[in-house]
Regions:
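Short, charge-rich, low-complexity alpha-helical interaction segments
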Residues: 118, 122-123, 211, 215
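Active-site-flanking beta-strand signature of metal-NTP-handling nucleotidyl enzymes
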Residues: 48, 77, 147
Length: 300
């Protein structure tokens, strides 16, 4: 991805100082937009937040020593939850030290930022400029950033492709997003005021994409791919009835009647136990179609 002298030594020897400066600026511009995947590029720091929080330094779990640095890690999680880039110190202090007065909050901010930088052992990871904090994407990979870019690319393909010509590209993007979304944002930790917004936004985006791409697969007859989308949707939230409906319909289309009826029974049980509700008329209608198909199969 980066231009280097090893790629073409003669090219570099012929360049003037001005041209070399241009190449350096080009390298910087390229590095500001790393590839979506974390494969093929080694970030000094990689942060996983979709599920269990994991922090890797040079592809190894960061060694905290004898005591886990609780406050710096909370600072880092809060920074990511607020967007990770150009977050004002006042936003961070309000989230982390809401009861502290201005001076005490600022001292806590300065101390915690120092400890976090020391923990990384690299000042390039965290940038403080004009009172705003950023994780440098040239040196730090965050799963949430990649996940949201993936979903954005999925939607761009969906908005342009009505023929199925980009099915392979779409499948690759969805497989990558499925592998990243192990669970909700910081799911293993207590929900806080600063984490709930991002958690719900990512969850809603993912659910929307699973439904949308599932419909795309149905439209083009890729029933098994649609089934995978809807099954993942139920893993994310098993109270969303439309996932049951579409899953039942896919099993009906592929003549997997037993599987479709099992989905209905699960839907009925979950809705009754958790919400005290009965399935919607559309769910019941698909169930009746499954029953009819079973009867036809038995009488054939």
């Amino acid at each position: 991805m980066r231009l280097s002298e090893q790629d073409n030594p003669a090219f570099f020897r012929r360049k003037s100082d001005r041209e070399l400066q241009f190449v350096e600026r080009l390298n910087l511009a390229i590095s500001e937009f790393p590839v979506l995947s974390n494969e093929g590029y080694t970030w000094p720091v990689r942060i996983f937040t979709l599920g269990r929080f994991t922090l890797l330094h040079r592809d190894q779990p960061l060694d905290y020593g004898r005591k886990v640095p609780h406050r710096p890690l909370v600072f880092l999680k809060t920074l990511i939850a607020l967007g990770g880039r150009d977050i004002s110190s006042s936003s961070l202090t309000s989230a982390l030290w809401p009861e502290a007065d201005g001076d005490n909050a600022q001292r806590s901010f300065d101390t915690t930022l120092y400890r976090l930088r020391k923990m990384f052992g690299d000042d390039q990871i965290l940038i403080l400029k004009d009172g705003k904090v950023s994780l440098d994407p040239r040196h730090c990979w965050v799963d949430v950033w990649t996940f949201e870019r993936l979903l954005g690319n999925v939607q761009r393909i969906r908005s342009k492709d009505a023929t199925g010509k980009d099915a392979y590209k779409l499948e690759q993007l969805m497989q990558h997003s499925l592998s990243l979304y192990q669970d909700h944002f910081l799911a293993k930790e207590d929900m806080t005021s600063w984490s709930v917004s991002l958690r719900e936004r990512l969850r809603s985006k993912f659910i929307y994409n699973l439904l949308d791409v599932g419909r795309y697969w149905e439209m083009h007859g890729f029933w098994d791919k649609a089934i995978l989308c809807y099954q993942k949707g139920l893993e994310v939230d098993d109270l969303i009835e439309v996932f049951y409906q579409r899953l039942m319909q896919c099993h009906l289309e592929t003549r997997r009647i037993s599987e479709g009826m099992a989905v209905y029974r699960r839907c009925r049980q979950i809705l009754s136990i958790v919400l005290g509700l009965q399935p919607e008329p559309e769910t019941e209608s698909i169930y009746q179609s499954l029953k009819k198909a079973r009867q036809q199969k038995q009488s054939a």
